Regions:
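Flavin (FAD/FMN)-binding glycine-rich loop and adjacent Rossmann-like elements that form
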Residues: 1-199
Length: 199
């Protein structure tokens, strides 16, 4: 989910402990923070972009954040019930993460205090308990046709004469899998590459 929160006390609903909350889901975040020692949430914990009216657009930031890595594999080909369960699991994870950051005593105090400034906005998504109803599904299908666009197109090493569209954003893929390799946790799939013009 891309998250809209607010730090306006008059418009804020506190982030509360979600039903079925399990702090062990966030053990890796604690391990990461112990090593990385972020100075603030925007320091590779949450990507907090300020919006008008004391609100945010929050996105994934760092190796353990709002992306529920690896839990979406069955979404593209899943039936409605499978997709519904995946979305419910993602919602549970996301709300649990926000609560964990603000309330778990093992989190550094400065990050807990910063998180507690934020809450769900009373005036947003009033028909969905003030939480965005739209999951942040970046991509689930790739069209395979007579021509398949690749990194070579993005970096202008290969062009086509009969283009039907244009893109102007970086190559930006979030992690899609979490593995244990030689006793160490590894995320796989993150691509952040820019520095080129529209393609």
């Amino acid at each position: 989910y891309r998250l809209c929160l607010t730090n306006d006390p008059a418009n804020k609903i506190d982030i509360t402990r979600p039903a079925g909350y399990d702090s062990s889901m966030f053990e890796l975040l604690l391990r990461y923070i112990a090593v990385f020692k972020p100075k603030e949430l925007n320091d590779r914990v949450l990507k907090i972009d300020n919006m008008p009216n004391h609100k945010t657009d929050i996105n994934n930031n760092g190796p353990f954040s709002t992306d529920y890595i690896g839990m979406n594999w069955n979404y593209p080909d899943g039936d409605y019930n499978t997709r519904k369960q995946i979305l419910a699991d993602q919602l549970h994870y996301t709300k649990g993460l926000l609560y964990f950051i603000g309330h778990d005593p093992r989190m550094p105090e400065h990050l807990r205090k910063e998180m507690l400034q934020w809450g769900y906005p009373k005036d947003e998504y009033t028909d969905n308990n003030n939480f965005t109803p739209q999951a942040y599904i970046r991509e689930s299908r790739r069209m395979i046709g007579a021509y398949v666009m690749t990194q070579n197109n993005c970096e202008a090493r290969e062009t086509v004469a009969d283009a039907v569209g244009m893109a102007a954003y970086t190559m930006d893929s979030h992690n899609c899998e979490r593995l244990v390799v030689n006793g160490m946790v590894k995320n796989e799939g993150d691509v952040q590459k820019g520095g080129f013009g529209p393609y």
